[in-house]
């Protein structure tokens, strides 16, 4: 006889473990367990049968895979957490006894851990790290915009801000930016780095109200892991681009405060110094060299006079042809990389400088801001007088009227920059002039429901009549049965014959009558084809199982919902277009 298996030794009971059991097994606190799970990427699992997994109990419990918890037992960070626990006890005892010097010594030898090995485990290739960079960047930009509080220290905020600026500096330098979208939440950017599309959100720099119900301990744990990952990625990117990491920080604000130096720059400086040292020779050495050259020339002339006369031979002249020279490819592959390379932008004080600065620099443009000129006027008046502003091609403003226009400048609103980047070409400036009503700023990633307003505009004019005809056909087909339709067709033929006789008597051409017949015939053929398709659907439904029918109903519900939404949006658009036309007529 086979042995009877004990209950709870196989299946779900063995594969899953509860959170309390996992904490007991690892011998750490709940807070440390959460931190460890975040670092290692372990998350709760949902067993198919909770009752079996919980050994008969139906109480609400969080489950994890037993193998994941077994994997955590050998983690070096776990050992550091235990060391920190003993360190905290010793420090508390020393402070309780009043031994300040001992407490200070203990604090200096505080156990520290690194997440480098975890980053290498979770992201074996660089492409994996880049693919997972969306969430880390969103988190870093969120904390960079937050004020320092008792929960979030100023050090954390400054570190997040530094990493964000380093990332933006790299994207601007390598010109990786592809898409921009200004929304209510903030500004969405998309860049292509090493073939991977990375999208992140930068919130607006408004005073933020920090909610009380947010657990900042968990968020700070995620931030700790993400900042380590971004450090790794930036180091690799800067090295591959031949730039020094971390970049040198200047006192000036914005991206211009990060000077990106090449690694070869110090070597070039050394070579230049060596050349200068070679040039600074003494006068005596130079005179000796000149005398030696003169003596050599005299000897050569004597040899030429003593030698036999040689016939003068005309040598062929080889001229360099431009046809042989090949066009070198551009350093930047994307079409947006050199979009604004020929332009210099003057940004007014009413426009958000940080957003436009990043966008324009990423597309090869140059910037002069009104705020920087005002600072220069106060701090260095002599440099301000020498400043040349005649090279400015575009001025970005966000005001309804301009009192004084500078000749030679093109005045545009900020949206022109964003729309030009999204369309990857320079858009006509007339629609974006000062005081003009701007066109809608659409998302470059499209609508989640599949609605595309640009396509609808193309279809609106030509297909408006066809849509109404199709609606009438559907109404006609739905009424009546097949027998009634046959009778109607016979009646229609009699009516046609009568109409033809009447039209001939009135003097109408036969070709015009044929055209009308063709239109009516096409309508009927469309109606019959739709009916056949519906019949096929019904037959297919009959062959389906109950499970498949339910799934099909859900699918149809989703499709109908999308279609209704599209219809509502198109109706709204038509109404808006009509109102615009009426206003134009009135004006």
UniProtKB/Swiss-Prot annotation:
Biased composition (Acidic residues): 295-311, 459-494
A single MF term (Gene Ontology): large ribosomal subunit rRNA binding
Biased composition (Basic and acidic residues): 529-541, 559-569, 578-587
Keywords carried by this UniProt record: Coiled coil, Nucleus, Ribosome biogenesis, rRNA processing
Location of the region described as Disordered in the Swiss-Prot/TrEMBL record: 290-311, 437-587
Entry-linked PROSITE patterns: BRCT (PS50172)
GO cellular component: nucleoplasm; PeBoW complex; preribosome, large subunit precursor
InterPro entries: BRCT_dom (IPR001357), BRCT_dom_sf (IPR036420), PES (IPR010613)
Gene3D superfamilies found in the cross-reference section: BRCT domain (3.40.50.10190)
Localisation: Nucleus, Nucleolus; Nucleus, Nucleoplasm
Role noted for this protein: Component of the NOP7 complex, which is required for maturation of the 25S and 5.8S ribosomal RNAs and formation of the 60S ribosome. Required for the transition from hyphal to yeast growth.
Binding partners and assembly: Component of the NOP7 complex, composed of ERB1, NOP7 and YTM1. The complex is held together by ERB1, which interacts with NOP7 via its N-terminal domain and with YTM1 via a high-affinity interaction between the seven-bladed beta-propeller domains of the 2 proteins. The NOP7 complex associates with the 66S pre-ribosome.
Family listed: Belongs to the pescadillo family.
Name under which the protein is recorded: Pescadillo homolog
Gene of this entry: NOP7
């Amino acid at each position: 006889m086979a042995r009877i298996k004990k209950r709870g030794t196989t299946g779900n009971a063995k594969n899953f473990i509860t959170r309390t059991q996992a904490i007991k097994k690892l011998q750490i606190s709940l807070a440390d367990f959460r931190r460890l799970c975040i670092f290692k990427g372990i998350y709760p699992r949902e067993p198919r049968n909770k009752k079996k997994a919980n050994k008969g109990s139906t109480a609400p419990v969080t489950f994890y895979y037993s193998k994941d918890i077994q994997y955590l037992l050998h983690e070096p960070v776990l050992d550091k957490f235990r060391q920190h626990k003993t360190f905290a006890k010793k420090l508390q005892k020393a402070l309780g006894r009043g031994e300040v010097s001992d407490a200070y010594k203990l604090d200096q030898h505080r156990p520290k851990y690194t997440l480098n090995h975890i980053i290498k485990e979770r992201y074996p290739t660089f492409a994996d790290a880049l693919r997972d960079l969306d969430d880390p960047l969103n988190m870093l930009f969120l904390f960079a915009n937050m004020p320092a509080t008792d929960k979030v220290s100023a050090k954390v905020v400054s570190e997040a801000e530094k990493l964000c600026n380093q990332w933006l500096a790299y994207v601007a330098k390598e010109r990786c930016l592809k898409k921009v979208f200004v929304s209510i939440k903030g500004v969405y950017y998309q860049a292509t780095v090493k073939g991977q599309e990375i999208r992140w959100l930068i919130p607006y720099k408004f005073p933020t109200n920090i909610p009380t119900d947010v657990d900042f301990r968990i968020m700070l744990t995620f931030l700790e892991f993400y900042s380590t990952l971004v450090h790794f990625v930036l180091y690799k990117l800067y090295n591959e681009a031949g730039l020094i990491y971390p970049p040198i920080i200047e006192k000036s604000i914005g991206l211009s405060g990060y000077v990106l130096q090449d690694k070869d720059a110090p070597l070039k400086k050394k070579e230049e110094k060596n050349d200068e040292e070679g040039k600074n020779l003494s006068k005596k050495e130079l005179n000796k060299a000149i005398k030696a050259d003169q003596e050599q020339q005299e000897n050569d002339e004597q040899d030429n006079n003593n030698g036999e006369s040689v016939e003068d031979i005309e040598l062929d002249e080889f001229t360099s042809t431009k046809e042989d020279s090949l066009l070198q490819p551009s350093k930047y592959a994307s079409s947006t990389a050199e979009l604004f390379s020929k332009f210099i932008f003057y940004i007014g004080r009413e426009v958000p400088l940080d957003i436009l600065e990043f966008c324009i620099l990423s597309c090869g443009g140059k910037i002069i801001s009104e705020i920087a000129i005002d600072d220069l006027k106060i701090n260095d008046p002599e440099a301000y007088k020498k400043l040349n502003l005649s090279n400015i091609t575009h001025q970005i403003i966000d005001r309804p009227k301009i009192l004084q226009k500078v000749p030679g400048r093109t005045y545009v609103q900020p949206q022109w920059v964003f729309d030009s980047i999204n369309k990857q070409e320079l858009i006509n400036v007339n629609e974006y002039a000062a005081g003009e009503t701007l066109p809608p700023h659409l998302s470059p990633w499209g609508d989640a429901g599949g609605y595309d307003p640009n396509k609808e505009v193309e279809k609106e004019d030509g297909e408006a009549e066809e849509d109404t005809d199709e609606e009438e056909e559907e109404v006609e087909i739905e009424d009546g049965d097949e027998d009634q339709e046959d009778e109607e067709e016979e009646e229609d033929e009699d009516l046609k014959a009568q109409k033809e006789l009447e039209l001939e008597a009135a003097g109408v051409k036969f070709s015009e009558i044929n055209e009308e017949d063709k239109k009516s015939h096409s309508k009927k053929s469309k109606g019959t084809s739709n009916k056949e398709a519906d019949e096929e659907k019904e037959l297919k439904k009959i062959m389906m199982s109950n499970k498949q029918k339910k799934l099909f109903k859900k699918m149809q519900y989703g499709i109908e919902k999308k279609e209704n939404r599209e219809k509502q949006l198109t109706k709204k658009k038509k109404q808006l277009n009509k109102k615009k036309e009426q206003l134009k007529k009135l004006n």
